[in-house]
Amino acid sequence: MIKQLLVSSCVLFSATFVVQAQNPKLGVSPIQDVINAMTLDEKIQLVVGSTGKYESQMEATIGNQGQLVQGAAGQVNGIERLGIPATVVADGPAGLRIDPKRKNTDKTFYCTHFPVATVMSSTWNKDLVYSVGTSMGDEVKHYGVDVLLAPATNIMRNPLCGRNFEYYSEDPLLAATICAAMVNGIESNDVGTSLKHFALNNQETNRTRNNVIGNPRTFREIYLKPFEIVIKEAQPWTVMTSYNLINGTMSSERCDLITEILRHEWGFKGMVMTDWFGGLSAAAQMEAGNDLLMPGKADQVKEIRKAVLNGRLSMEILDRNVRHILEYIMQTPRFKQYVADNNPDLKGHALVARNAATEGMVLLKNNKNVLPLVQKIKNIALFGNTSYDFIAGGTGSGNVNHAYVVSLLDGLKNAGYQVDGDIYKAYIEYAPKAKANLPKPKNPLEAFLPGHFIPEMSLAELNMSAAVKNNDMAIITIGKSSGEFLDRKISDSFNLTKEEKDMISGVCNAFHKAGKKVVVILNVCGVVETKSWIGGPDAVLLSWLPGQEGGNCVADILAGKENPSGRLPMTWPVSYNDVPSKADFPNPETVKVDDVLGMFMGKGIGSKGNVKNVDYTEYNDGVYVGYRYYQTKNVPVSFPFGYGMSYTTFKYGKPVVTKDAQGNIKVLVTVKNAGKVAGKEVVQVYVAAPGKDMDKPTRELRGFAKTKKLQPGESETVTIDIPYKNLASFNEVDSQWQVEAGDYKVMVAKNAADRKPLTTVITEEAGVTEKVRPCLLKEVK
């Protein structure tokens, strides 16, 4: 009997051992053992997102495939028998985007609407941005999401790009520095980010089929550089490829972009995923190194299986991609069995959002120190639709399901001001009537497009005499928003509409006749034309799209509670005709909504793919993007890159500029607050290269620093390092980064157009900082 029990026990132990041997567990067994144990279908299940069960992309609601977290953008499949959990990814760049309400519960799941990326870069303060990222990542973790599909570090090539509000700057260094701080802040919570859109996603028109045509130097120096810096400084968990083609090949199918540049040159260790429904060939994406196809389609499953079985796609390549996904999964909270409590500190995060938005606002004009408002200002006449309906952010995946948005009306009231009740009543009655007259959507997909905004109400509807008599001053808000799928129009988005200009001129004329001041607030998604109207108001404050606390932030600055310290992250041209890429960017005036939706579904406008700036876009502006063009070509601008006013004045001491044996430059500058109000200053360092061996801009931003809040009379010495390698330009002929010999002008300036920078000349020796394989050429075989 004892012998029989021993035999039975041995058999049972043996069977258990066989089961365990057949079913290794992720995190317990070596990853290779887990991969070896997977069937072909399981491997495909892992590399294709969770909606791969659907037969068409229309069956999977765009940007809402979350089963584990309702409203999340997508899900990576799990394999239970191998200890692989499903993981969740969700939008977006201004805060987590999930469903705020769920069935069978009264609990809400709102997220903080933080300021958009453009506001973050306008702070020029990486420590502040890190704190925003920390708060944002905290919500990601508390709500059970593993990866936030953000940030986006594409370059603002043209002011009409519909998603510029999601991007950081026209300058690679500023964009990368702020973006890296955001990544590090978010990931400090042990959740992931997805750096996007890799690469050259600089227009929304026909973004899924647009072919970007350009040269490797332009790509590497301007458009890839911010990605490179962020990868090296922050190592985000994931990278998201872009929709567009690059020199004839889909970005998500370019091995030279994803494997050679991203992984081999820059040392990226994480996972690469597609943008939603991006690319044409699943097998080609797998081969290029695009590990995960999102959100997943049934035909991708079929194509990969067929490609493996017929030998077109090797099992070695598939296993490589599976490994990258498994390595990602092992980092996630869900793999580590973190239990989300759905209870983030929303009140604390709102305060973080408020502080960040305030610091990112830019004072463009302040005649005779109209701002901050003097104490005798009590009663305010508030004009403009968006004064009462402030715009927190853009549309599409960059939107956030917030609990509230503080309007300028409420912000002023919170600050103790009285707002004219008759004007308020007129706007509240006007808005629903005007909205009823807006065109009705004809296509259900139009819900994903930027919405229509109602025209400004005529001042004839108001008793302007009473408004002037009963109020101490006037404030006008101009609102402009944008989003995915559509680029902005020149006529009514870059330029102000006739109704908006009439409102500004009418209010200014009426109040100025009575000796009263007028302030304009620009609650806008990006650059707008100002020359034609800016002579009217006494002050102009650029609030951007500041998130849910916007009205409070504006009021803080108007009242002098906070001193504006934001600086422009892009140039504001006098006219759109001055933009260097104007001839090589879509004209949204001619694009129809049905065409836009067709393009998203993979149906290009051009029947032969030959419509300029729609089917293909040539980057003929080269490296002369933004201020690099305006300053080099001496083109006048309305407001230069790096510009911003303050309520105080700062004086700079003589810079101390040194160079070590390796050619690295160090700049020390002492900044003194010479005014009467506490404030922060942004010190900007530009460098002019000799430009003998290669055509170069006259100045390029090579470093910056922001002071702490300096009290009147207080000084601070800031240090700015410029590594030798950061002086290099890309030589296409030899495929190398090289520094030319000669004299370099190191200029400490207040903005890119500063005519009297504090200049020091440093002599550098020639050198090659890196030699790389030729990539991103126009013909890819």
Give residue ranges: language-model regions.
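Glycoside hydrolase catalytic-domain context in secreted enzymes
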Residues: 21-729, 738-748, 752, 775-781
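Acidic/proline-rich low-complexity IDRs
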Residues: 4-5, 11, 372, 757, ...
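Bacterial Sec-dependent N-terminal signal peptides
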Residues: 1-25
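Short beta-alpha junctions and helix-cap segments that line functional grooves
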Residues: 732-734
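Generic detector of low-complexity/intrinsically disordered segments
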Residues: 7-8, 14, 703, 712, ...
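Short beta-strand elements
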Residues: 754-771
